[in-house]
Amino acid sequence: MKASILEKLEHLAERFTEVGALMGDPDVISNQDKFRDLGREYAELEPVIKCYNEYNTVLGNIAEAKVLISDSDPDMRAMGQDELKENEAALEPLELELQKLLLPKDPNDGKNVFLEIRAGTGGDEAAIFSGDLFRMYSRYAESKGWKVEIISENQGEHGGYKEIITRVVGQGVYSELKFESGAHRVQRVPETESQGRIHTSACTVAVMPEADEMAEVNINKADLRIDTFRASGAGGQHVNKTDSAIRLTHIPTGVVVECQDERSQHKNRAKAMSLLASRLSMAQEEKAAAEQASARKSLVGSGDRSERIRTYNFPQGRVTDHRINLTLYKLDEVMQGALGDVIQPLVNEYQADQLAALSE
């Protein structure tokens, strides 16, 4: 491993020890903000240092094995050869894991997200599939201990949603769901199809990290038009008799957001402002990324909503992610929320791209 990487790891190990000691300091414990920040740093460093300690242990074992190999006793030499082979085999995966752990972190990875699903081509069938995708993401979120809040919804005439916007809250939400932005295509026989013909429909998914503060995108209140209207209902549970729903229009960009989930106009306005800030922030990031884009396009997560990223073929029970040529014949499990088998290969490919870029 490169000397510069080992030097960085040694520095991180010293910092890990320092943070652990600080968290036991009564003055730090009494300062909730400081204690929380240190706790977050400790949690981020812990997997790196654990892997680094394992790496050092294996290096020590290799050194001991080499001593045994030079022993005059044949049995000791044979034992040394076995230990050397075993530990050298363990060293390479640990080096790779350490390099992955040291990759630059996406500053948005720890953020909550706004997840938007919209029916595209396919009419009623596309709206029904939007509902299927919403349930798939909701079940995956539940398995991860995340919370899903509906911000606004426009239900389809025969089920599902023409559009549904949700907020997903939890640890590391964006780090996993950021790969879901794009066009999702479904191939199946609709219930209303008497000839048994397969229809193709599509939905678009957009995943945006929640903006920390409105200041991030400098929203000027003079640039906002605020309209109130009567909510059609929150999650289908009640009909609001007051004009508590909020529609915000950002005049310079034309971006419009709505929130009608809460009974309180104040709460709806706060959620709508958060969604607006996130959309504007994402637009700024996409513009900057486009300006700085390299000639080599990343295989994973361009985030273009028109880019077809995945196909769900029901007759074949198949899910195909077109970005990495991944095909799984476990459609039922995926639609029930077992998204990990799709997301993890995308994460692996993304990290491989980062490692390749570092070595260039």
Curated annotation (Swiss-Prot):
Sample GO molecular function, one term: translation release factor activity, codon specific
Top-level taxonomic group: Bacteria
A Gene Ontology cellular-component term: cytoplasm
Pfam families: PCRF, RF-1
UniProt keywords, alphabetically: Cytoplasm, Methylation, Protein biosynthesis
Modification(s) after translation: Methylated by PrmC. Methylation increases the termination efficiency of RF1.
Subcellular localization: Cytoplasm
Residues the record lists as N5-methylglutamine modifications: 237
Family: Belongs to the prokaryotic/mitochondrial release factor family.
HAMAP family reported in the protein's UniProt record: Rel_fac_1
PANTHER family the record matches: LD18447P
Known role: Peptide chain release factor 1 directs the termination of translation in response to the peptide chain termination codons UAG and UAA.
Name of the featured protein: Peptide chain release factor 1
Taxonomic source organism: Saccharophagus degradans (strain 2-40 / ATCC 43961 / DSM 17024)
Gene: prfA
